């Protein structure tokens, strides 16, 4: 890797550069498509691995995903949302991303249950999902630890409530937003 770059000025830059969308936002916006029965479209979608992983996970849950990579347009149409029957394929996808935990809130709203496989995808150290689970439990979900992951059940519609995290967590905040959007009450 280059340790420094030297930039020499004096010549105006000309031309055009196409910049694709925010790589950290798009996978979460894709998960949010589970919150509606209507088609969701994202434009300016970047060509990143997480888009492929989330597309595959959405398809496994019954969502039709059409991605025009050249145009950068991604259309997601929820059909009959369901829990995947193939936990092996889901495990394979989960091993390359931490996104599956964010499916929990939307699936609890749509199905009353969610299965979250053991998660991978992090090279910066341990990043437990206990804050995610606490938010979902505070909203009324119940969790059952299974050999392959976590089964979450909401026997009644989720109920929003104030959330206080012990310290800032981007993922738990995203989970809170995805779970609270259709929950009864105010978060």
Predicted regions and their residues:
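Structural preference for solvent-exposed beta-strand-turn elements
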Residues: 1-187
């Amino acid at each position: 890797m280059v340790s420094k770059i030297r930039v020499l000025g004096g010549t105006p830059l000309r031309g055009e550069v196409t910049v694709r969308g925010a790589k950290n936002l798009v996978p979460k916006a894709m998960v949010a498509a589970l919150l509606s029965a209507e088609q969701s479209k994202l434009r300016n979608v970047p060509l990143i691995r997480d888009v492929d992983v989330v597309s595959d996970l959405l398809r496994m849950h019954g969502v039709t995903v059409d991605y025009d990579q050249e145009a950068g347009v991604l259309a997601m149409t929820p059909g009959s949302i369901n829990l995947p029957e193939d936990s092996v394929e889901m495990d394979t996808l989960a091993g390359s991303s931490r996104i599956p935990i964010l499916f929990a809130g939307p699936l609890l709203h749509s199905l009353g249950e969610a299965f979250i496989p053991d998660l991978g995808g992090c090279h910066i150290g341990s990043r437990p999902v206990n804050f995610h689970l606490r938010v979902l439990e505070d909203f009324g979900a119940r969790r059952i630890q299974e050999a392959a992951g976590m089964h979450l059940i909401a026997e009644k519609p989720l109920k929003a409530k104030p959330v206080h995290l012990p310290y800032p967590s981007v993922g738990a905040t995203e989970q809170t937003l995805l779970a609270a959007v259709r929950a009864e009450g105010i978060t």
